[in-house]
């Protein structure tokens, strides 16, 4: 029977690595809830969330950064009364709802940066334009209910190339605007390793993040980082059982629809433990869907029905669907 196995020590190792880069780490809870529960109990991590249900699941409102999206006064009041004080908004309507609360809080404006590898039509681009942010900051800075004012920026998942944040922010904000900002949240996007993604760029990315943090500290601005995939992916493996092998096809007792939706969403291919030698096989899930494919070609030595086939770095976005009557895959903590 298929199962996800979370290695707690890897979760904590990844957290501790990223913690050295920023003043605050806020884990993107949507990436993998089970990893979030470990971080809640074992670290001082904050959590970036997008729903009241996630707020209730975590039950630590003092460590929540809440992202508003199309909310109303009822939702905003409910979240605030639960104890949340840190908020991110990405449009003026959601901002006005928050201001109408007339309660003390910490606010971050989500700002869009110029994109070079993400195209509208497939991806929605979140955030205020930089000119709008600059117009809003003076009045928000003077608002007595806003205790800390910040900017949130985030490009995309698996961001391997666009990390020149220091130069971008320098070009956007004059010094008088930066003096009114308490916090910069750089979002997530730190890549993980897959068959079709190599993470050799991590050292350069970390150097860019450190450069930004040091520059912000010179201006007395705190930096928040929002890892999700970077912590969750390498902490989890997916163990499946081979049901049958024929004509260089392997059918496993799982499906991308309940075990690897990330395959669709971000076009990644999971690594397989022990691959590299033998014959090429296509690894297919157990549904009748022709695109239920974990890997189009993986070199394996003499796989047999009943063998365990283990996918590595499998912890990001493990949500499931009920397609063809599939059940969620059980999760175990190692």
PLM feature segments, named:
Residues 1-105, 141-147, 178, 303, ...:
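A charged N-terminal "starter" segment
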Residues 11, 51, 79, 109, ...:
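Conserved, mostly hydrophobic/aromatic
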Residues 28-34, 50-54, 69-71, 90-94, ...:
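Active-site beta-loop-alpha junctions enriched in small/polar residues
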Residues 47-48, 107, 184, 223:
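Residue-level marker for buried hydrophobic side chains located in beta-strands
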Residues 76-82, 114-121:
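Acidic/polar active-site rim loop that often engages polyanionic ligands
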Residues 81, 101-102, 118, 185, ...:
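Solvent-exposed alpha-helices and their adjacent loops that cap or buttress functional pockets
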Residues 115-246:
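Active-site loop/helix belt of alpha/beta enzymes
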Residues 222-334:
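Charged (often Lys/Glu-rich) extended helix/loop segments that serve as interaction or gating elements
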């Amino acid at each position: 029977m298929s199962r996800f196995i979370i290695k707690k020590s890897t979760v904590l190792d990844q957290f501790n690595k990223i913690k050295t880069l920023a003043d605050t780490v806020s884990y993107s809870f949507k990436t993998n809830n089970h990893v979030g529960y470990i971080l809640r109990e074992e670290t001082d991590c904050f959590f970036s969330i997008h729903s009241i249900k996630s707020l209730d699941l975590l039950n630590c409102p003092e460590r929540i950064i809440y992202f508003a999206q199309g909310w109303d006064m009822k939702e905003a009041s409910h979240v605030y009364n639960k104890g949340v004080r840190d908020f991110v908004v990405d449009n003026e309507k959601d901002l006005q709802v928050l201001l109408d609360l007339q309660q003390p809080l910490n606010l971050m404006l989500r700002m869009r940066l110029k994109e070079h590898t993400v195209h509208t039509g497939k991806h929605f681009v979140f955030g205020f334009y930089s000119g709008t942010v600059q117009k809003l900051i003076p009045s928000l800075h003077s608002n007595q209910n806003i205790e800390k004012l910040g900017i949130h920026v985030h490009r995309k998942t698996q961001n391997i190339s666009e990390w020149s944040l220091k130069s971008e922010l320098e070009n956007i904000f004059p010094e008088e605007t930066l003096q009114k900002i308490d916090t910069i949240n750089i979002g997530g996007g730190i890549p993980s390793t897959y068959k079709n993604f190599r993470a050799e760029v991590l050292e350069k990315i970390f150097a860019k993040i450190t450069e930004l943090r040091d520059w912000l500290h010179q201006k007395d601005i705190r930096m928040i980082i929002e890892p999700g995939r970077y912590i969750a992916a390498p902490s989890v493996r997916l163990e499946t059982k081979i049901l049958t092998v024929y004509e260089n096809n392997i059918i496993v007792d799982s499906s991308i629809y309940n075990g690897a939706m990330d395959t669709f969403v971000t076009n990644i291919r999971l690594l397989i433990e022990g691959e590299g030698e033998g014959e090429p096989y296509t690894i297919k899930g157990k549904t009748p869907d022709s695109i239920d494919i974990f890997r189009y070609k993986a070199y394996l030595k003499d796989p047999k029905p009943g063998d365990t086939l283990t996918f590595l770095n499998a912890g990001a976005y493990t949500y499931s669907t009920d397609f063809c009557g599939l059940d969620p895959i059980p999760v175990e903590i190692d």
